[in-house]
């Protein structure tokens, strides 16, 4: 009888933490969870133009936050933007080009042969220091430093 009582008490004690879960915390997310509008930020655009800086300042991002930014090319020159390490540290939700939505599995670079705008929506994931740059360029203004914290 004592053994049975001890066994039942032990099973009940092991089951208690399951019922102690704290579900009343408010993380600020809506129905879409981490993709909710309350977790979304817009970044300043990147400008692709011959001899012009890519951006005004480096980006500092928070891991777990959803971001959107535009790449605006003026068509002054055929220009690309590379950042393979950065693109592997984020999850790209969508790329929008003239109303067409693309949902890629990954990305290494983008290139503009003429004037246009591209919007990229992504979730910052892996903390670290990254960059996007115009390939073959050496100037500091042709490179955007990105930190994910």
PLM region descriptions:
Residues 4-14:
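Sec-dependent N-terminal signal peptides
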Residues 16-20:
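Sec/Tat signal peptide C-region and signal peptidase I cleavage site
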Residues 21-37, 105-149:
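Extracellular/periplasmic metallocenter environments
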Residues 31-69, 74, 105:
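N-terminal edge beta-strand
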Residues 55-85, 119-125, 131-133:
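Beta-strand cores of secreted/periplasmic/IMS beta-sandwich domains, seen most often
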Residues 80, 86-98:
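Short aromatic-acidic-glycine turn motif
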Residues 94-109:
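Solvent-exposed beta-strand/loop surfaces of large extracellular or lumenal domains
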């Amino acid at each position: 009888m004592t053994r049975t009582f001890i066994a039942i008490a032990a099973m009940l004690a092991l089951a208690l933490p399951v019922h102690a879960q704290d579900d009343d915390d408010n993380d600020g997310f809506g129905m879409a969870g981490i993709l909710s509008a309350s977790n979304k930020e817009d970044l300043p655009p990147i400008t692709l133009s011959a001899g012009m800086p890519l951006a005004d300042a480096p980006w500092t991002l928070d891991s777990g936050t959803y971001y959107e930014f535009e790449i605006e090319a003026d068509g002054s020159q055929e220009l690309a933007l590379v950042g393979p390490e950065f693109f592997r540290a984020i999850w790209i939700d969508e790329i929008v080009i003239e109303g067409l939505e693309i949902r890629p599995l990954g990305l290494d670079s983008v290139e503009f042969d003429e004037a246009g705008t591209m919007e990229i929506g992504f979730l910052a994931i892996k903390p670290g220091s990254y960059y996007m740059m115009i390939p073959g360029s050496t100037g500091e203004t042709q490179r955007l430093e990105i930190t994910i914290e």
